[in-house]
Regions:
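Serine-hydrolase-like catalytic core of hydrolytic proteins
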Residues: 1-88, 104, 109, 118, ...
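Amphipathic alpha-helical segments that form well-ordered structural scaffolds
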Residues: 3, 66-72, 89, 188, ...
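Short, well-structured alpha-helical segments that form the helix of a local strand-helix-strand
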Residues: 24, 86-102, 189-190, 307
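Acidic carboxylate-rich catalytic motifs and surrounding loops in phosphoryl-/glycosyl-chemistry enzymes
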Residues: 81-93, 254-258
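Catalytic-loop region of hydrolases
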Residues: 90, 95-104, 109-115, 362-384
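Substrate-gating cap/lid region and adjacent catalytic-acid/histidine neighborhood
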Residues: 97-300
Length: 384
């Protein structure tokens, strides 16, 4: 970000008018910038696509342990007085050797911990959402944030989860992807996410879902989408509410809801002709205006307004513009406008782009109760 701020003028940009945006891990990085004080002067607006993670970040001790395992695998842990930290030894390794070390080291990591942001007490004094909860973040930056309808379907497909899951298969699958529940909790989740909608949770109609995936598969991917504190609508709602409470000048939430039919993404889990899911990363081609990558007709036409929203926000902190359906600012259920938790639903067809209120409300209310509030949040504000 510092490099961009300093050098973007050479590319025709304005270093004092930067919008930072990213998707997935890139969205995580943008969230980090919102909480990282050194970044505050380097951008004016932020876009977080499928990146509102609320699962903490590695501690310095975690990172040091990971580095020690790399040293051990690379046989670089004893550098002697000339190389006490083993860095010179590591720098001599070729790319193939480094790759082999990384692959081997990955097998040693806990399932919930990879290479990522570190709470080092300097750049990040606490996990980003803990800082935002405490009001210790960049309150001057307007934010666009959102998710895809079926985020975790990508991972279930990519990792080969049985497409015809039964109830027992669901129970076995949830903890593999980070959603643990006792018997009482699991029973409550099953009621909330019932495929027949009796718990207040909406699925595509049976005629649209088809029979490629079983009912329990749909329930599993939606429980994970909204229950794992990283990607889905509930994490995104949690972030939006915190930003609103913290005083962010404008928050715009979206839900991308179109199953992409284009054949331009062979091998991408959940995309392609006949697709019925809207997996992780579905929105990217539309954000970049990639109509040529999309199926002709309504799908390709959706790219123009989606891209326009992003460009308008980057230019003036407001995604709205001539000819576009109105994208309301986010307000929570008690907001002055009384709009409820409003998102802009992005889909094809007449009325496909429209404000939607109280998205997955009962499920997200329950997921919020499952999330333990951080201790001593008030102390974090003093760090800023």
């Amino acid at each position: 970000m510092a490099w961009v701020h300093e050098h973007i003028g050479a590319f025709g940009g304005n270093g004092s008018d930067v919008t930072v945006f990213g998707e997935s891990a890139g969205g995580n990085s943008v969230l980090n910038h919102l909480a990282q004080k050194a970044s505050f002067p380097l951008y004016r607006r932020a876009v977080i696509e499928s990146g509102a993670y609320d699962s903490g970040a590695a501690t310095l001790a975690d990172a040091e342990a990971q580095f020690a395992s790399v040293q051990w695998l690379a046989k670089c842990q004893h550098g002697g007085s000339a190389d006490p930290d083993g860095l010179a030894c590591l720098r001599k390794l070729g790319p193939d050797a480094l790759r082999d070390v990384a692959v081997s080291q990955g097998a040693l990591l806990p399932k919930d911990r990879g290479w990522g942001p570190v709470v080092d007490g300097v750049a990040l004094p606490q996990a980003p959402l803990d800082l935002i909860r405490a009001g210790a973040y960049n309150k001057a930056a307007p934010v666009v944030a959102g998710t895809n309808r079926d985020e975790m379907s990508y991972f279930l497909i990519a990792f080969g989860v049985d497409t015809q899951l039964d109830e027992a298969g669901l129970e076995a699958t949830l903890p593999v992807f980070g959603l643990t529940a006792n018997a009482t909790d699991l029973a409550a989740l099953k009621r909330l996410f019932a495929i027949d909608g009796s718990g207040g949770y909406a699925y595509p109609p049976r005629a649209q879902r088809g029979d490629k995936y079983s009912d329990w598969w749909w329930v599993a991917q939606r429980m994970l989408t909204d229950g794992v504190p990283a990607l889905g609508a509930c994490s995104n709602r949690r972030l939006a509410r915190l930003l609103l409470q913290g005083g962010t000048p404008a928050v715009f939430n979206y839900l991308f809801a179109h199953p992409t039919q284009s054949a331009a993404f062979p091998g991408f889990p959940g995309l392609g002709p006949g697709s019925v899911t809207v997996p992780h990363a579905s929105e990217i081609a539309y954000v970049f205006g990639g109509a040529y990558l999309l199926a002709a007709g309504e799908e390709a036409a959706l790219a123009a307004p989606v891209s326009a929203y992003w460009l308008n926000f980057a230019r003036g902190a407001n995604p709205n513009g001539p000819g576009l359906p109105q994208w309301p600012r986010y307000t929570d259920a008690a907001g002055a406008g009384g709009e409820g938790d409003v998102v802009l639903r992005l889909d094809v067809g007449s009325g496909g782009i429209a404000a939607q209120r109280n998205l997955r409300q009962k499920a997200c209310d329950y997921m919020d109760r499952r999330t333990v509030a951080p201790k001593d949040a008030g102390k974090l504000a003093a760090m800023m």
